[in-house]
Amino acid sequence: MSTIIDGKAIAAKLRAEIATEVKILKEKGIIPGLATVLVGEDPASEVYVRMKGNACQELGMHSVKHTLPATTTEAELLALVARLNSDPTIHGILVQLPLPKQINSDTILEAISPVKDVDGFHPYNVGRLMVGKPTFQPCTPYGVMVMLREAGVDLAGKEVVVVGRSNIVGKPVALMCLQQHATVTICHSKTRDLPSKVKEADVVIAAVGVPEMIKGEWIKEGAVVIDVGVNRVGEKKLVGDVEFAAASQRASAITPVPGGVGPMTITMLLYNTLEAAKKTGEGNR
């Protein structure tokens, strides 16, 4: 049986450390501030934004939520982003995706000041990540890397297979693994013979959004499995991208769904916001 890499426990430990640092900043008159922007009424997005706001308040951060109608124009959203960019009480700006079809997501993400881009999606920060410079790292991949570190996994020389090539998870997590001296293979919908690729992996990172696509029998004995997927099956059941029951018989360590990578994503957002506040140093007094 595998060791379970408990995302909730790792996130709780990190949040306690963040809360301590927030207190220290507050003594200097700086309150880390996060602005979340939600356009429209997507139920899942509403839940995510609420969770982010609650998490901020729990750790003593300043949180502002902007909810705009689904009919909002790109120009109106850009105007809000510009105001937040110039607001000294806001250190991090998060525009919840997806956006309505009349708004170009890339245009909005590029309008966010790179020093407030706590999601790590601005091309400037993506470029810095690419060349290994200090930057805001995208929250989910960052969470994955912290979990691997906390689980005692040394990636140097390891065969890492990333299944999924999104800009949000697949590509950045592959880069981060490369920076830790892993040999990285990225698999996707056009990959030939996916099972044979996965079977070679010392570490599998699954981020495709297809329920239990990665079969347990594909996992090499003793491999580490990080399952980023969260897929709803039926009314209430949540499953990952990996066939958990079968994979956990072969893996040395595995993340569960729920309770694995999910709790880490918001925690790393809070960490990035804290770091942004430290850098700007002005704050909400």
Swiss-Prot record:
Coiled coil: none annotated. SUPFAM superfamilies: Aminoacid dehydrogenase-like, N-terminal domain, NAD(P)-binding Rossmann-fold domains. InterPro entries: Aminoacid_DH-like_N_sf (IPR046346), NAD(P)-bd_dom_sf (IPR036291), THF_DH/CycHdrlase (IPR000672), THF_DH/CycHdrlase_cat_dom (IPR020630), THF_DH/CycHdrlase_CS (IPR020867), THF_DH/CycHdrlase_NAD-bd_dom (IPR020631). It catalyses: (6R)-5,10-methylene-5,6,7,8-tetrahydrofolate + NADP(+) = (6R)-5,10-methenyltetrahydrofolate + NADPH; (6R)-5,10-methenyltetrahydrofolate + H2O = (6R)-10-formyltetrahydrofolate + H(+). Signal peptide: none annotated. Pathway: One-carbon metabolism; tetrahydrofolate interconversion. Keywords: Amino-acid biosynthesis, Histidine biosynthesis, Hydrolase, Methionine biosynthesis, Multifunctional enzyme, NADP, One-carbon metabolism, Oxidoreductase, Purine biosynthesis. GO terms for cellular component: cytosol. NADP(+) binds at residues 164-166, 189, 230. Its EC number is 1.5.1.5, 3.5.4.9. GO terms for molecular function: methenyltetrahydrofolate cyclohydrolase activity; methylenetetrahydrofolate dehydrogenase (NADP+) activity. One of its GO terms (biological process) is L-histidine biosynthetic process. Homodimer. Catalyzes the oxidation of 5,10-methylenetetrahydrofolate to 5,10-methenyltetrahydrofolate and then the hydrolysis of 5,10-methenyltetrahydrofolate to 10-formyltetrahydrofolate. Belongs to the tetrahydrofolate dehydrogenase/cyclohydrolase family. This is Bifunctional protein FolD 2. The gene is folD2.
